[in-house]
């Protein structure tokens, strides 16, 4: 079941986000946050979110400031004149705390593409203790290799089970 909610961004505009919750909940497997790329919006992920929802996951897809339903006072892709990265990190953390209040004792994972992947990478550096794993689709550099690999491995364990083994080359990196 999909429903839309909003919260007030640290940039003083409303951020719209969509929550997809399973129809029948015995126990939610995890909460998945989707951070999309710059020229996308939350509705692009309806099919994926519904698929994961049917598998027992709660999926949260937000349109950060300057995207999709959150465009009210901003042009597409425009975030404002201030320290944008800091504001986006605070907004992401606020949304996670909102969901943590609803789904306690539930693992949290992030999935990101393009700019969304870059945001998650920064979020992991600041708030990595608040979630269990991430899947980044796009350029990944600048995060400590050990922390990055652990978060990715945790995501694969969630999807494939505890006994799943990755190919040794799957997470090979040039990061130092």
Map each language-model feature to its residues.
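Conserved alpha/beta-hydrolase
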Residues: 44-75
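Alpha/beta-hydrolase-fold enzymes
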Residues: 121-176
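N-terminal cap/lid segment of alpha/beta-hydrolase-fold proteins
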Residues: 1-24
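Glycine-rich nucleophile elbow surrounding the catalytic serine of serine-hydrolase chemistry
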Residues: 112-122
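Proline/glycine-enriched tight loop/beta-turn segments at coil->beta junctions
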Residues: 13, 23-31, 57
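Alpha/beta-hydrolase active-site loop
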Residues: 80-100
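Alpha/beta-hydrolase fold nucleophile elbow
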Residues: 102-114
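Active-site glycine-rich loops that stabilize anionic/oxyanionic intermediates
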Residues: 37-40
């Amino acid at each position: 079941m999909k429903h839309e909610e909003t919260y007030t961004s640290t940039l003083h505009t409303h951020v719209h986000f969509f929550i997809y919750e399973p129809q029948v909940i015995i126990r939610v497997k995890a909460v998945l946050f989707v951070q999309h790329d710059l020229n996308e919006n939350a509705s692009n992920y309806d099919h994926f979110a519904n698929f994961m929802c049917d598998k027992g996951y709660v999926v949260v897809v937000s349109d950060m400031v300057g995207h999709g339903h959150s465009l009210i006072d901003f042009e597409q892709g425009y975030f404002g004149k201030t320290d944008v990265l800091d504001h986006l990190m605070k907004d992401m953390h606020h949304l996670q705390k909102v969901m943590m209040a609803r789904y306690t004792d539930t693992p949290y994972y992030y999935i990101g593409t393009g700019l969304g992947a870059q945001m998650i990478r920064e979020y992991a550096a600041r708030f990595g203790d608040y979630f269990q794993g991430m899947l980044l689709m796009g350029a990944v550099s600048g995060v400590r290799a050990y922390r990055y690999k652990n978060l990715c491995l945790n995501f694969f364990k969630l999807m494939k089970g505890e006994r799943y083994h990755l190919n040794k080359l799957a997470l090979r990196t040039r990061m130092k």
